[in-house]
């Protein structure tokens, strides 16, 4: 196996994380350490799976079965990011409201999941990373 297939998701994650932090910090006009994690622009998960699908397309071709698997996985990840995790965030908000000011309750994170724009940003970033990594590891 070529090492590039293991390096791609790691490099993509390491590049997209700081980009997301800087974008969120600029939006908040302060260092946004509280926004590190799930959610935000661009979507790390979408970028990682898209970078792998892009790399597979560039190296093995879009007709290769691995590309089909990568695209399927990407759709599952993106659907999860957009719908399921947003529902989890709404449930967390409801639980936080019910708990009120109970000191025994540790507030749950309410910002979960991604908007379609955040997912699209992850897709664009992932495609760019796939092309960049392919060029660097030829």
Language-model segments: which ranges?
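N-terminal signal-anchor/start-transfer transmembrane helix
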Residues: 8-24
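Polybasic, low-complexity association/targeting segments
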Residues: 1-6
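Membrane-embedded catalytic cores of phosphoryl/pyrophosphoryl-handling enzymes
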Residues: 14-17, 29-138
